[in-house]
């Protein structure tokens, strides 16, 4: 009897990839045979780090784990899922606001392609953590190492610091 691999996408801009994201990956991994961390090129969100830097930083976190791959995409999530043979989308939820947004997205994704969304709730101590908060703290020169997944921290700090330095000189 042949079984189908359970492939899931964990999607986001991951700018930067935080310990909250890392927690979702750790908890999603046992549920699936393969987890693709799908890094979005979003025209609707302003990102600090280039897509190649975000992908490389996340790849460094999961180097050597054959169950995890990291890929960039710039189209609809359901189109990425179809290309990769993924039948599931994993999303993290921190709040009621996140839940409402994710429920709406899940409904549309299911209507478009039949893909199912699996929601994992943030651990309580991580429910206030967001990439936006980390970027803001970085902008003001604060140490964010406690919230950024290792080894992405050093690469992100260098990229953000260089970017902020260039903006201040203009």
Where does each model-flagged region fall?
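Nucleotidyltransferase catalytic core that binds NTPs
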Residues: 1-170
């Amino acid at each position: 009897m042949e079984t189908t691999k359970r492939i899931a996408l964990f999607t986001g801009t991951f700018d930067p990839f935080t310990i909250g994201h890392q927690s979702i990956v750790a908890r999603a991994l046992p549920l699936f045979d393969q987890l693709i961390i799908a890094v979005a090129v979003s025209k609707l969100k302003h990102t600090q780090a280039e897509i190649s830097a975000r992908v490389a930083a996340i790849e460094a976190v999961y180097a050597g784990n054959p169950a995890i791959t990291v890929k960039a995409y710039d189209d609809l999530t359901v189109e990425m899922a179809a290309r990769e043979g993924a039948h599931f989308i994993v999303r993290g939820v921190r709040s009621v606001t996140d839940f409402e947004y994710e429920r709406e997205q899940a409904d549309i994704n299911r209507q478009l392609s039949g893909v199912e969304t699996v929601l994992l709730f943030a651990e309580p101590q991580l429910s206030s953590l967001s990439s936006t908060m980390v970027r803001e703290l970085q902008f003001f020169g604060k140490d964010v190492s406690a919230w950024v997944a290792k080894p992405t921290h050093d690469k992100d700090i260098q990229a953000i610091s260089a970017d902020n330095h260039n903006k201040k000189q203009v």
